[in-house]
């Protein structure tokens, strides 16, 4: 499976996929810059009278519900409909769905308009969507339990898609295959937007590589490796310096680094 990760990164660099992102106002710039850093092309288009057509031109669609307005909600329905009609991968980031009931209702309605290729959230969000008890604080997960794999597999089977739960150890599952990504750094929890950036990267990789499971693993591993390197090169204590180094290091992750430092446990 490890060769799939390097294949996915090569595909991303070669194809420069256009990623249509409807994301939150807190991290829109971070998502755009992270996509540019790895070689994708971001388009933060969310006007309701444009998204249906635009989503059909993209390589993938990234829906992030972090600061969901009524206007964004309508745009998301139109965009997922357009993307699904064209067979374009749709990545959902269900930010704070464990804390805000309206967001779970929105996700259910999105499922009526189209199909998710990947659902990427923290463990609390994944457990909430899977109908399991989840401990959350706003957009953050307080869960670190041993039932994360079960939650991911259950949600993957329910939606027929890949599910990823990020945390100290990232979990990726598709109902049959699963893996644990053991790279990363606690510094990623000390800046706003690391999870959103990871979701955007998943969209970038899925826009270039057909195997959504492999693309998701490659994206999250890229984010984790960049975080490790950013901590090393920035001194590891100042979050603002770390953020700047993170974007730089995203641009430097290559096949050799994945082979040398990637710690992925295939289950």
Swiss-Prot record:
The keyword Iron does not apply. Pathway: Cofactor biosynthesis; thiamine diphosphate biosynthesis; 4-methyl-5-(2-phosphoethyl)-thiazole from 5-(2-hydroxyethyl)-4-methylthiazole: step 1/1. InterPro entries: Hyethyz_kinase (IPR000417), Ribokinase-like (IPR029056). Keywords: ATP-binding, Kinase, Magnesium, Metal-binding, Nucleotide-binding, Thiamine biosynthesis, Transferase. GO terms for molecular function: ATP binding; hydroxyethylthiazole kinase activity; magnesium ion binding. Substrate binds at residues 44, 193. It catalyses: 5-(2-hydroxyethyl)-4-methylthiazole + ATP = 4-methyl-5-(2-phosphooxyethyl)-thiazole + ADP + H(+). Catalyzes the phosphorylation of the hydroxyl group of 4-methyl-5-beta-hydroxyethylthiazole (THZ). HAMAP family: Thz_kinase (MF_00228). This is Hydroxyethylthiazole kinase. It comes from Desulfitobacterium hafniense (strain Y51). The gene is thiM.
């Amino acid at each position: 499976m490890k060769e799939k990760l390097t294949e996915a990164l090569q595909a991303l660099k070669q194809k420069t996929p256009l990623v249509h992102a409807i994301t939150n106002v807190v991290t829109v710039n971070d998502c755009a810059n992270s996509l540019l850093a790895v070689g994708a092309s971001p388009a933060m288009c969310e006007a309701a009278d444009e998204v249906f057509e635009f989503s059909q031109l993209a390589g993938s669609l990234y829906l992030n519900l972090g600061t969901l307005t009524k206007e964004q909600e309508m745009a998301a329905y139109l965009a997922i409909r357009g993307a699904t009609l064209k067979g374009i991968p749709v990545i959902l980031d269900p930010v704070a769905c464990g804390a805000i009931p309206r967001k779970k209702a929105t996700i259910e309605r999105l499922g009526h308009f189209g199909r998710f290729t990947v659902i990427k959230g923290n463990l609390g969000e994944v457990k909430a969507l899977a109908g399991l008890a989840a401990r959350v604080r706003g957009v953050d997960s307080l869960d670190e339990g041993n039932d994360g794999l079960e939650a991911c597999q259950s949600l993957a089977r329910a939606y027929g898609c890949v599910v990823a739960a990020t945390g100290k150890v990232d979990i990726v599952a598709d109902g049959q295959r699963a893996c644990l990504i053991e790279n990363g750094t606690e510094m990623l929890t000390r800046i706003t937007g690391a999870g959103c950036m990871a979701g955007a990267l998943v969209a970038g990789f899925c826009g270039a590589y057909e195997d959504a499971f492999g693309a998701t693993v490659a994206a999250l591993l890229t984010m984790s490796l960049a975080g490790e390197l950013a901590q090393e090169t920035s001194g590891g204590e100042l979050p603002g310096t770390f953020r700047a180094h993170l974007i730089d290091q995203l641009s430097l992750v290559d096949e050799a680094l994945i082979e040398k430092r990637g710690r992925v446990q295939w289950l």
